[in-house]
Amino acid sequence: MSTDPISLQEIMSFLPHRYPFLLIDRIVEVEQGKRILAIKNVSFNEPHFQGHFPDHPVMPGVLILEAMAQAGALLAGYTDPDSVRGQLVYFMAIDKARFRKPVLPGHQLNIEMTLLKRRREVWRFGGKAMVDGEVACEAEVMAMTRKREESHE
């Protein structure tokens, strides 16, 4: 288990996402092959808040799910770095998604994802995103790794 701080540069070495779609700010803890704890700091300056909703900004649920999927992709990367680094990790499916609490500007989203199953390049994760100790979202997500060149076919 690693609780050493993980730099943004290292996060970016596993994830191809960049602003405004890189939704993980920090990794708090990683247990290879088991789980990851990550943080997304929610800022009013994020572009989606201009229209969702102008008088009552709420982080879109699909972006909470995307942050959870990115945390899962990072767990895959730390579990098997040789087969994930330099690959694209594609979001394949969402199951059992439930939204329990709105996520607002100023909140810190604490994301915990657990590896449920892996079969070659297909990964299944389960987890939750929490705000102030309360579950904001829970879901299972599936992802698949592919070489970057194969992704354009």
UniProtKB/Swiss-Prot annotation:
Catalytic activity: a (3R)-hydroxyacyl-[ACP] = a (2E)-enoyl-[ACP] + H2O
Gene Ontology BP annotations: fatty acid biosynthetic process; lipid A biosynthetic process
UniProt entry tagged with the keyword Heme: no
Enzyme Commission number(s): 4.2.1.59
Pfam families membership: FabA
InterPro entries xrefs: FabA_FabZ, FabZ, HotDog_dom_sf
GO molecular function: (3R)-hydroxyacyl-[acyl-carrier-protein] dehydratase activity
A single Gene Ontology CC term: cytoplasm
Record: active site: H52
First-tier enzyme category under EC: lyase
Keywords for the protein's UniProt record, in alphabetical order: Cytoplasm, Lipid A biosynthesis, Lipid biosynthesis, Lipid metabolism, Lyase
Chief localization: cytoplasm
Cell compartment(s), UniProt: Cytoplasm
PANTHER family in alphabetical order: 3-HYDROXYACYL-[ACYL-CARRIER-PROTEIN] DEHYDRATASE
Family, as annotated: Belongs to the thioester dehydratase family. FabZ subfamily.
Free-text function comment from the UniProt entry: Involved in unsaturated fatty acids biosynthesis. Catalyzes the dehydration of short chain beta-hydroxyacyl-ACPs and long chain saturated and unsaturated beta-hydroxyacyl-ACPs.
Protein name: 3-hydroxyacyl-[acyl-carrier-protein] dehydratase FabZ
Organism name: Magnetococcus marinus (strain ATCC BAA-1437 / JCM 17883 / MC-1)
Upper taxonomic lineage: Bacteria, Pseudomonadati, Pseudomonadota, Alphaproteobacteria, Magnetococcales
